[in-house]
Amino acid sequence: MSGVNEIRSTFLDYFRDAGHAVVPSSSLVPKNDPTLMFTNAGMVQFKNVFTGVEKRPYVKATSSQKCVRAGGKHNDLDNVGYTARHHTFFEMLGNFSFGDYFKADAIELAWTLITKEFGLTPERLLVTVYADDDEAAGLWKKIAGFGDDKIIRIGTSDNFWQMGDTGPCGPCSEIFIDQGPALAGGPPGSPDEDGDRFLEFWNLVFMQYEQVEPGVRNPLPRPSIDTGMGLERMAAILQGVHSNYDTDLFRALIDAVAHAVSRAPEPATRASYRVIADHLRSTSFLIADGVLPSNEGRGYVLRRIMRRAMRHLELLGARDPVMYRLVPTLVREMGRAFPELVRSEALISETLRLEEGRFRKTLERGLAILDAESRDLSAGQNLSGETAFTLYDTYGFPLDLTQDALKARGIGVDTQAFDAAMQRQKQAARAAWQGSGEAATETVWFGIKERTGATEFLGYETETAEAVVGALLREGGEVETLKAGDSGIVVVNQTPFYGESGGQVGDTGTISGPGLKARVTNTEKKLGDLFVHHVTVEEGTLSLGAAVELKVDHARRSAIRANHSATHLLHEALRQVLGDHVAQKGSLVAPERLRFDISHPKPIDEAELTRVEEIANAVLLQNAPVVTKLMAVDEAIESGARALFGEKYGDEVRVVSMGRPVDDEGWEVEGRLPNFSIELCGGTHVSQLGEIGQITVIGESAVGAGVRRIEAMTGTAARRHRATESRTLSQLAGLLKAPVADVPERLSTLIEERRRLEKELADARKKIAMGGASGGGDEAREVNGVRLMARVVEGVEMRDLKGLADEGKSRLGSGIVAIVGVSADGKAGLVVGVTEDLTGRYDAVGLVRAGAGHLGGKGGGGRRDMAQAGGPDGHGAEAALAAIAEALAAA
């Protein structure tokens, strides 16, 4: 029972049998929790349950939570690989009570699990409790039979947990194991507590107070329990090893690394193998949860982890991408517990392969510069911060990678100077931005917004509205009026026009008044909530302070609404067909069509696209109302609404819910959530799904590494597209004199027949060419003591000439072959071949260049035994062969 997978199962099964709901791990990307870069503890997904904001259908839960600590204040990156227990990715086993059981049951459950199920010897165990927690100390004496020597009272924050300055809080009790006197270190609370002898593996948090303000705590009416056990630590304990990296899971990953680099681990390289094994887990799980490498936010942390692992692969001798080859081992070891790894295996592998290929050049350049700059430094000295910043800024070499590369030599980095250089760059960038023409145009909006305030958007409820003109601009500057023929920008106090954002294009329409007509050609948003209308005045004068009527182009808005709602249906259908790794990476919602970019590592085949389209249309046909609701952002996320990665949300968000869940065949089913699609979205949408009409996917293509683009149409545009396709298919059927259903097979047969005939024709031309043609007599002639076979061949492409030359050389045995091929469009290709016995005397490159000029070409290239050239003038074929013969005669 000591394997990692068995330990996880035993823990979860034990608490399931004790009445706990087994809850799957939440994503590593917290659901709109601005305080966290990544999920770093088991309680994160239950945070709102503990605070009472959210209700769930269970009061006891257990989970094995994926956690990452590699960014923000929870950052173990620098220590990973160099200690026995630091990781960027780890699993936290936990059991939770939301007002059900409390200390006595929590301690009883924990003690029974570790001594009965896991079989730990009680004599090796000890615990800590908070200094004032007499209740917990008494329970440990009663349940475990511990004396005071086994119950250590700690008065510091290590044994008192709180969520923040206010909210639930309470004392902790940590469980330790004595790993024996062979390891250094003393018990918790002693001066030597940082040693490895006494290992903490489970923390029980007793949430019994609510902190209303610093120093003021009130008892909670329903105390709760939050526990956390490190799976990797427990595996090391049960497997009798003192390092997490010696457990079965890490041994498998390290063996895979050793196989990939064809090198067994040694004491000097041990840290590199550990870094790679650890970082493989964190990078793979982050990608599976929708994070892709980038230069900011979570994507940048992912890139740093990737590049640190890749640098250690380079230390082990790898010169080609390796990390992607390790993914199958990880999936085999952890895929059963975390099926998202299986679903995302292709995306993970391709992302790692591409990123490692890109980083190879950066790594080579950066390490060369780092080596040169640090050559004269010795242990205890620091690399200059300016040099470290140059590596970062110019060569894309992260600071932590520089620090890691120098760590083995005992050399540090002047981080203060690095930070100062970074600050100077930011200041220079801001100054450059303010001095640019674009900036001069953009800064005008600050003054306008300060004067007029934000624009009130009315477009969710209406397409017409009256408003007052608050600002007019022409050619980047404010003006009092816009006259007939003028183009400019209008800012009003309220508007029904949607401003371009979130991938949805801006509205168009009209602004009118007495004697006034202006055409709105686009609408944008500036500074988040200032709507600016691009207009051309067609009649009258548009004046500052005037009352005007705004009217959105209804037909265009309707088409945009349909396309935007369709993107939501397609997004969810794509996730259902391709996997949960699919995340929106960009979109364009226009009246004519929609474009949708997603994270996916390979082309989406026709069968998958068909399933996506069928699922989306099945939901559309429900004609269910599209429900929009304003909610607090935390409440929205907890309700299941999908937040787009990288988007910034305020305290209140708009939640758009569509349709009822369906299976892959389009039949309605009971889903985990009440709606097929629930997203945070500020765009405009249809009121009933049936208004979309139909959804037709018209294309799929690559945008960049790991990103695919879907293009689709809806409504009338989709029907017209289908009608055009249908007419075209009918015309093809008529030309082929076949039923429509037989067109693909008939076309396939014709294409294969054409290929066969083309090959036969090419073969016939080759035979004719080598059997006798103009310019060469029946076989070959002797020039300067060398046999020369020269041919002009009609209708043979350049790609076939080399084969003819090889055949000619084979026939001659010893000699030179020169062939000019003239294509149907009159262009010429020239090939010269020299048999091996003559390459010491004659160079095919020189001979081909002698003839190329007569074909209108320049130069030519190849080897001494085979060279080629081309030109636009096939009429010079005979002259080219004659020139080659002359060059041969003169040699």
Swiss-Prot record:
Enzyme Commission identifier(s): 6.1.1.7
Catalysed reaction, written as an equation: tRNA(Ala) + L-alanine + ATP = L-alanyl-tRNA(Ala) + AMP + diphosphate
Subcellular location, principal: cytoplasm
Gene3D superfamilies: 2.40.30.130, 3.10.310.40, 3.30.54.20, 6.10.250.550, Bira Bifunctional Protein, Domain 2, Threonyl-trna Synthetase, Chain A, domain 2
Cell location: Cytoplasm
Residue positions binding Zn(2+): 564, 568, 681, 685
Similarity annotation: Belongs to the class-II aminoacyl-tRNA synthetase family.
Domain notes: Consists of three domains; the N-terminal catalytic domain, the editing domain and the C-terminal C-Ala domain. The editing domain removes incorrectly charged amino acids, while the C-Ala domain, along with tRNA(Ala), serves as a bridge to cooperatively bring together the editing and aminoacylation centers thus stimulating deacylation of misacylated tRNAs.
Name of the protein in question: Alanine--tRNA ligase
